[in-house]
Amino acid sequence: MMSVNRFTSGRLPVFLRKSPFYYSRAYLHQTCVFKQNKETAQDSPELLAKSSHLNSKPLDVSNKAPVKTAQNKIPLAHSKYESSKYELPKWKEALGELVIRAFHLDMDRVRAGPVAGSYYYKICKEQGLQYEDEPLSETAKYFYEDLKLPRTFSQWFQITVLHEWILFVRMRAMPFKYGRNYQQKLVDRTFSDIELRLFEEMKVNSGRIADQYLKDFNTQLRGAIFAYDEGFATDDGTLATAVWRNLFGGRKNIDMVHLESVVRYIYSQLYVLSRLSDREFATGKFKFVPPGVKVEKLTPKQEEELKAKTIAKYEALDKDPKTLPSERSRLSYTN
């Protein structure tokens, strides 16, 4: 399987299914990711959060400043190249392939920008994203309604940081020069986007004030990453404490069931990431598991079947002479 020091991986397609309000229990065995006892049944994080009997009130209900306006939607930036509808002209695509082949470019390094700096930042950002006067997404409902977190810009940042840390854990298991590059691209894009949003959405008109905000967010990011690392390397209680200090802002009267729900949510994401090979992860084959979905551990037989399919797929891709230079990779697909 894997360890804290080396987050090795396998296959992505773990069995995911929507959790109905009532279903037969599926039991998970202990692993380095799932630390619950095998006698403990696993509901989805969303159902666990909703099961609390405390009926606690939303935190900071008077502060509902939206993190994004509905009238001015900018998915990531002004660049048209990050639009899901954009298609590169054929001549540019052909020229790019020629340059890659001629200069023997390492696509695993080049790919870090569009994958980590664009796609992975996008999915981290979207987990807590909200639009003024528009319904929340299912994941945003989990954080703002089920966990009763305040709907503020700072809270959105903490939700984004939590998901970035989850990806950092997997990136560190990649070969060092690639994993470090992916982490740097993700962090760089985070702060370039925050700077853009401070000026255009939060209406910050002073460069000095914006710089101070960026320094504060950088401090929060470093502190959160250190705290989550400590929790992941020790025990669930320490990880829950890190979640309380960062995601919940160290507020009093926090519902412990909500903390348990977030810890379960984290372990679910890490388990899915542990099933991904380096090549799959580096080429953007990961999506966060929605909080309403339950993750079930694969059986040894399922592991072997999925591993065999993945190996066959990438062996055929590497041997195919029609595979474009931009689609090739040196990263492992067997780990």
UniProtKB/Swiss-Prot annotation:
GO terms for biological process: mitochondrial respiratory chain complex III assembly; positive regulation of mitochondrial translation; protein stabilization. GO terms for molecular function: mRNA binding; ribosome binding. InterPro entries: Ubiq_cyt_c_chap (IPR021150), Ubiqinol_cyt_c_chaperone_CPB3 (IPR007129). Keywords: Chaperone, Membrane, Mitochondrion, Transit peptide, Transmembrane, Transmembrane helix. Its main location: mitochondrion. One of its GO terms (cellular component) is Cbp3p-Cbp6 complex. Disulfide bonds: none annotated. It is found in: Mitochondrion membrane. Belongs to the CBP3 family. PANTHER family: UBIQUINOL-CYTOCHROME C REDUCTASE COMPLEX ASSEMBLY FACTOR 1 FAMILY MEMBER (PTHR12184), UBIQUINOL-CYTOCHROME-C REDUCTASE COMPLEX ASSEMBLY FACTOR 1 (PTHR12184:SF1). Chaperone required for the assembly of ubiquinol-cytochrome c reductase of the mitochondrial respiratory chain. Present with 14200 molecules/cell in log phase SD medium. This is Protein CBP3, mitochondrial. The gene is CBP3.
